[in-house]
From Swiss-Prot:
It comes from Danio rerio. GO terms for cellular component: cytoplasm; membrane; neuron projection; plasma membrane; presynapse; SNARE complex; synaptobrevin 2-SNAP-25-syntaxin-1a-complexin I complex. The gene is snap25a. This is Synaptosomal-associated protein 25-A. Expressed in several regions throughout the adult brain, including the mesencephalon. The keyword Membrane applies. Keywords: Cell membrane, Coiled coil, Membrane, Repeat, Synapse, Synaptosome. May play an important role in the synaptic function of specific neuronal systems. Associates with proteins involved in vesicle docking and membrane fusion. Residues 19-81, 138-200 form the t-SNARE coiled-coil homology domain. Its main location: other. GO terms for biological process: exocytosis; locomotory behavior; mitotic cytokinesis; synaptic vesicle fusion to presynaptic active zone membrane; synaptic vesicle priming.
Length: 204
């Protein structure tokens, strides 16, 4: 009789311990899910900011291209004025050849590799029988399975986000290099054009 009582007490203790572990495990999966959802939100915000930054860089590069176009017109006008005034020196050819590097490497385009939009798809990670080994086989373990499935899907999305961010950052770094080259080229051409114009006005 005493042995039966001891066994019942031991079984009750085991059941209580199993319930405690189930509660702790459930809370753990809830925290995991909350953390990966916060990471996903941060990733989405980062992608949006990168996209906005890409648009700003595109506008800046378009401005550099427009300045280049305007400078071609200004240099042509200075050439015509130089011929009219009898000035033979024509550094425009030299300027154009020196600027060719800056203006000849835009083949990849500003938005050549925009990041692919992240699709909220869950990667199929479920194993037959679920993610956990059943002990209590109740609603808590069902929720644990669901939480872990969502965690797995979000982690898959985070991986895609990281790849998209890396691609976009690489694209923007190349674009920033182009913008710097074009800005240097434009500044040089503007300075030289100003010197020529000043010389013409002084000689007149």
């Amino acid at each position: 009789m005493a042995e039966d009582s001891d066994m019942r007490n031991e079984l009750a203790d085991m059941q209580q311990r199993a319930d405690q572990l189930a509660d702790e495990s459930l809370e753990s999966t809830r925290r995991m899910l909350q953390l990966v959802e916060e990471s996903k939100d941060a990733g989405i915000r980062t992608l949006v900011m990168l996209d906005e930054q890409g648009e700003q860089l595109e506008r800046i590069e378009e401005g550099m291209d427009q300045i280049n176009k305007d400078m071609k017109d200004a240099e042509k006008n200075l050439n015509d004025l130089g011929k009219f005034c009898g000035l033979c020196s024509c550094p425009c050819n030299k300027m154009k050849s020196g600027a060719s590097k800056a203006w000849g490497n835009n083949q990849d385009g500003v938005v050549a590799s925009q990041p692919a939009r992240v699709v909220d798809e869950r990667e199929q990670m479920a194993i037959s029988g679920g993610f956990i080994r059943r002990v209590t086989d109740d609603a808590r373990e069902n929720e644990m399975d669901e939480n872990l499935e969502q965690v797995g899907g979000i982690i898959g999305n985070l991986r895609h986000m990281a790849l998209d961010m890396g691609n976009e950052i690489d694209t923007q770094n190349r674009q920033i290099d182009r913008i710097m080259e074009k800005a240097d080229s434009n500044k040089t051409r503007i300075d030289e054009a100003n010197q020529r114009a000043t010389k013409m006005l002084g000689s007149g």
